[in-house]
Amino acid sequence: MGGAVVDEGPTGIKAPDGGWGWAVLFGCFIITGFSYAFPKAVSVFFKELMHEFGIGYSDTAWISSILLAMLYGTGPLCSMCVNRFGCRPVMLVGGLFASLGMVAASFCRSIIQIYLTTGVITGLGLALNFQPSLIMLNRYFNKRRPMANGLAAAGSPVFLCALSPLGQLLQDHYGWRGGFLILGGLLLNCCVCAALMRPLVAPQASGGAEPHGPQRPSPRLLDLSVFRDRGFLIYAVAASIMVLGLFVPPVFVVSYAKDMGVPDTKAAFLLTILGFIDIFARPTAGFITGLKKVRPYSVYLFSFAMFFNGFTDLTGSTASDYGGLVVFCIFFGISYGMVGALQFEVLMAIVGTQKFSSAIGLVLLLEAVAVLIGPPSGGKLLDATKVYKYVFILAGAEVLTSSLVLLLGNFFCIGKRKRPEVTKPEEVASEEEKLHKPPVDVRVDSREVEHFLKAEPEKNGEVVHTPETSV
């Protein structure tokens, strides 16, 4: 589903559901891939960073957490920038920031400097690309929006399949510094995607005249009215709890395998398996959600996806060998893909198109706090116990709790709300028949009108002059 991005085009623009929208979808696919896969892909460098700086699991986990926190927490800033400058310029600047952060990180001499470069600068750059790309996608698609969101969300697993082995390969050949430098160059592709975000323009009236219509009020940079929506509040609370555990398994599964004695390349392949399954899960979930009979119940489908994900984490905690982790990654990829494809589609279904830009930024801001807590808390638990099982149990419990909050909240607070009395279908049909019935032809006799006009004044003793007698 921050500060309200009110970067809306002129009134009367209909979403094309195709055309240049496919180019926008491709750009959103790339941006989503970098935004979500990058925080997980950098985890392949964690072991070498621990040896380089003499730090623990929780210290390296902060890199992914800060990246995700910037991606989520800068929602209001992205909103105001887009409202002021538009989607395309903001994304161009964001692409430069994302690249600059990784290039600068390759020269860092302490973990704090990596937090500032990879975490803050690159994270800000990805945020300035991610939110505007989603806004543009939802402007170009309406009827096909669930499918478009599912296809765009598939960018995350596709890039995860590519970036994780690539990161391991770069680390083996060039070390973590050379790997960061090359990844910084790859992030410049965000600028290419920004160029695809062509704004929608209202069609001109015949003769080149500007279309006449009501003037829109000046947009607000921060629209907090969405907090009066009960459905939005339930979604925001559930999503914040979900994020506490959602990103923990992908961050730790590679280290989990290495701790079992699995070779580094084979361990990194787990993320490729997860991503490969995720590639098919997201478009499939988007297609199913777009079905007429399913779309009204998308909130409950999203709740099921969260429950499935949390249950997978709990069962994954029992894995004792590489085969068990492979099975875990397969089912985690399915559930994770469902969550990724549905989260923003459900948010739009709850708040509507007009308030989506406000709602998404505010939700991302709320989730930022949870992102800062999730992976580091898992790292702290791992440092204290040295047992990966407890990390996966904690993550699963958090995601399961979020699914119950969303399900029960919508069922009891939304679905059970007292609805106004509905008129019977027969009465509705009768009323419509009366409304569409042609009026009775009432004829007026001019002589009766003349007689009435003469009679009224005579009652008061007045003299009446008709047009004929006045000549």
From Swiss-Prot:
The modification Phosphothreonine is found at residue 466. Keywords: Cell membrane, Membrane, Phosphoprotein, Symport, Transmembrane, Transmembrane helix, Transport. The chain crosses the membrane at residues 18-38, 62-82, 85-105, 110-130, 150-170, 180-200, 232-252, 268-288, 299-319, 322-342, 356-376, 392-412. It is a multi-pass membrane protein. PROSITE patterns: MFS. Residues 1-17, 83-84, 131-149, 201-231, 289-298, 343-355, 413-471 are cytoplasmic. Residues 39-61, 106-109, 171-179, 253-267, 320-321, 377-391 are extracellular. It holds the Pfam family MFS_1. Detected in testis, small intestine, parotid gland, lung and brain. Small amounts are detected in heart, kidney and spleen. Expressed in skeletal muscle. InterPro entries: MCT, MFS, MFS_dom, MFS_trans_sf, Proton-linked_MCT. The modification Phosphoserine is found at residues 430, 470. GO terms for molecular function: lactate transmembrane transporter activity; lactate:proton symporter activity; pyruvate transmembrane transporter activity. GO terms for biological process: lactate transmembrane transport; plasma membrane lactate transport; pyruvate catabolic process; pyruvate transmembrane transport. GO terms for cellular component: apical plasma membrane; basolateral plasma membrane; lateral plasma membrane; nuclear membrane; plasma membrane. Residues 429-447, 447-471 are annotated as: Basolateral sorting signal. It catalyses: (S)-lactate(in) + H(+)(in) = (S)-lactate(out) + H(+)(out); pyruvate(out) + H(+)(out) = pyruvate(in) + H(+)(in). It is found in: Cell membrane; Basolateral cell membrane. Interacts with BSG; interaction mediates SLC16A3 targeting to the plasma membrane. NCBIfam families: 2A0113 (TIGR00892). Two basolateral sorting signals (BSS) in its C-terminal cytoplasmic tail are required to direct SLC16A3 to the basolateral membrane. Proton-dependent transporter of monocarboxylates such as L-lactate and pyruvate. Plays a predominant role in the L-lactate efflux from highly glycolytic cells. Belongs to the major facilitator superfamily. Monocarboxylate porter (TC 2.A.1.13) family. This is Monocarboxylate transporter 4. It comes from Rattus norvegicus (Rat).
